[in-house]
Regions:
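Secretory targeting and sorting signals
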Residues: 1-28
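Subset-of-secretome marker
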Residues: 3, 23-274
């Protein structure tokens, strides 16, 4: 995969027009060659380093009720930092705001995610909790990780293999939902994506639109569309994210109904932090 090919051709032409020693020309050529995007991403995924993200995402659910076409929209904006483990995202410190045309904007909240645990707070949530506690801890179900997904090297390779370069450093592609998720049971659907790279072939921007359809007439929706627009910056930044002090945390399971209701009203996400 060669990105920025036109720029490299121009560089080579300029070098060849000047008389330089063969060894020097060879060194210049090696230095100019861009790193493969997948290798560039892999090189960043090391403990102690991270990346800053700004993400806008949305879900549009179309369904029919009493022979009337209905639609639900939920939008989420996420800003913060991901910390890497060995080959993946191991922790996150993010500010999240959710909104919908039906309910308006919910109070924003902060979430720290580490492994299967997520810790959520904001001023209203802290006020609703027992004295001395300011964070609610929840645990991801099954073997899921509470940390938000980042594009993995394998996913990046798949997308590049199924994309075409439409401009310098910009790729566009499509795939079936089953192929994109490497899961034949994923159901009917399609995925459209755009990838943007900087001069070092590091991702700066991804846009992914996924459309899914019900498997049969018994499903409660007609169509579901997921849109995710993620911008990356500060690759390789030194990052250290730690869970809140245990003395400040209370498990969601230990909240009584009244306290949980107050926390949700203050912005605690009852369906999960992401």
């Amino acid at each position: 995969m060669k990105l920025f090919f036109a720029g490299l051709v121009a560089t080579a032409a300029a070098v060849s027009a000047v008389a330089v020693p063969a060894q020097a020309a060879s060194v210049a050529s090696v230095q100019a060659a861009p790193v493969d995007p997948v290798k560039a991403l892999k090189a960043q995924l090391v403990p102690g380093r991270g990346v800053k993200i700004t993400e806008s995402s949305g879900i549009i659910l179309d369904f029919t009720a009493d022979d009337r076409a209905m639609q639900i929209r939920v939008n989420t904006r996420t800003v913060g930092t991901l910390a890497f483990g060995k080959g993946n995202a191991a922790a996150a410190d993010l500010r999240v705001r959710m909104s919908s045309p039906q309910k308006g904007s919910n109070p924003p909240y902060r979430v720290i995610a580490e492994g299967r645990n997520a810790y959520v707070t904001n001023a209203g949530i802290a006020k609703a909790l027992p004295s001395g506690r300011s964070w609610i801890q929840s645990k991801a179900s099954g073997h899921r990780n509470a940390v938000p997904d980042i594009v993995t090297p394998a996913e990046l390779k798949f997308m590049l293999d199924n994309a075409s370069e439409v401009a310098t450093g910009e790729y566009q592609g499509t795939a079936t939902l089953a192929d994109f998720q490497h899961d034949r049971s994923a159901g009917e659907g399609s995925v459209e994506f755009r990838l943007y790279f900087d001069e070092h072939n590091l991702l700066t921007h991804t846009v992914v639109d996924t459309t899914t359809y019900p498997d049969d007439d018994t499903m409660a929706y007609d169509q579901m569309v997921f849109h995710t627009d993620t911008k990356y910056s500060g690759w390789g930044t030194k990052v250290k994210i730690a869970a809140p002090a245990a003395s400040k945390v209370i498990s969601e399971k230990k909240l009584n109904a009244k306290t949980l209701k107050a926390a949700i009203k203050a912005g605690y996400p009852e369906s999960g932090p992401f």
